[in-house]
């Protein structure tokens, strides 16, 4: 048996749902999708869900992951085994841990490939900071996986599909975190994993102000702007949602233009599936040139304006 009888899908990020649903179609005979509202439920059915389970009744001061208890109860009530697919977001991983505990299931994070043999999941993912690929065969009846972006192609919606809709009512967990306040933050409104062209900056750009040079290039060629982890996490020059690497975005654009990025393996794991890699770096020995199809050795601050002017003609 090379499929599970049932798969359960949930995504806290709507843009990740289509790829999770495509993976679900390949891995199981029946697809169940947990959603938070009617609109997401309708989308899930169009993407292939046989059953939609609307999570309902959570108080405003409670967290989405506190649905884990009723989600686990629902999963157990409808089968003695099954596969759970979640995005590898922070909330996805937290929910995976809670579901794994309640289902007595093995949990595997950041899966890059998933296959099923004899009713058991085999998962591959990066280990040792991207230096190797680890393979795990999950023996527990339930398997809970968080999936890296780009592992599956996105499912295409079909408005003619039909499915059944159910409601799962909120039950307060015995121990919970209560939200006392919220603070809005600037976040990435662009789905970088869908971008055809990406310009990505590293610390070699020199300063936060110099990122404007990369933004001008993006505008000239219709690209989206990304960055390396140090730019987002250490320097705080750009939003967390824009950094490319093993622990965040895994991209497959037609063109990845790396500006001032050294090319460490942890970053390149997220970029080396690009069709073409173009690198700009003043260090001729930078590892990025081992991955690049094309490269320029020089100061990005001088090269970017000239490149933008040439491509804008």
Curated annotation (Swiss-Prot):
Alphabetical UniProt keywords: Electron transport, FAD, Flavoprotein, Transport
Taxonomic superkingdom: Bacteria
Pathways per UniProt: Amine and polyamine metabolism; carnitine metabolism
UniProt: FAD binding residues: 255-283
One Pfam family in the UniProt entry: ETF_alpha
Gene Ontology BP terms: carnitine metabolic process; fatty acid beta-oxidation using acyl-CoA dehydrogenase
Molecular-function annotations in GO: electron transfer activity; flavin adenine dinucleotide binding
Subunit structure: Heterodimer of FixA and FixB.
Function comment: Required for anaerobic carnitine reduction. May bring reductant to CaiA.
NCBIfam families: PRK03363.1 (NF002889)
HAMAP family: FixB
Family: Belongs to the ETF alpha-subunit/FixB family.
Name listed for the protein in its UniProt record: Protein FixB
Underlying gene: fixB
């Amino acid at each position: 048996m090379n499929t599970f009888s049932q798969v359960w899908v949930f995504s806290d990020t709507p843009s990740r749902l289509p790829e999770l649903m495509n993976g679900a179609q390949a891995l199981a005979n029946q697809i169940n999708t947990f959603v938070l509202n009617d609109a997401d439920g309708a989308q899930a059915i169009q993407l292939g869900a046989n059953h939609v389970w609307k999570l309902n009744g959570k108080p405003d001061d409670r967290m989405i992951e506190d649905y884990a208890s009723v989600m686990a109860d629902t999963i157990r009530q409808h089968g003695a085994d099954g596969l759970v697919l979640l995005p590898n977001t922070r909330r996805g991983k937290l929910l995976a841990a809670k579901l794994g505990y309640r289902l007595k299931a093995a949990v595997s994070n950041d899966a890059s490939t998933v296959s099923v043999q004899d009713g058991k999941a085999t998962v591959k993912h990066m280990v040792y900071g991207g230096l190797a690929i680890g393979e795990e065969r999950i023996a527990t009846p339930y398997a809970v996986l968080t999936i890296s972006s780009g592992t599956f192609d996105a499912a295409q919606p079909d408005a003619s599909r039909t499915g059944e809709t159910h409601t799962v009512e909120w039950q307060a967990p015995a121990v919970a975190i209560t939200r006392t306040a919220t603070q809005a933050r600037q976040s990435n409104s662009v789905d970088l994993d869908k971008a055809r062209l990406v310009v990505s900056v590293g610390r070699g750009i020199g300063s936060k102000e110099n990122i404007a040079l990369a933004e001008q290039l993006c505008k000239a060629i219709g690209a989206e702007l990304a960055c390396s982890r140090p730019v987002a996490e250490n320097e705080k020059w750009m939003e967390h949602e824009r950094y490319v690497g093993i622990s965040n975005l895994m991209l497959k654009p037609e063109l990845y233009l790396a500006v001032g990025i050294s090319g460490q393996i942890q970053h390149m794991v997220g970029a080396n599936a690009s069709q073409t890699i173009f690198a700009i770096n003043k260090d001729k020995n930078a590892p990025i040139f081992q991955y690049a199809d094309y490269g320029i050795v020089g100061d990005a601050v001088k090269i970017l304006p000239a490149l933008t002017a040439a491509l804008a003609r």
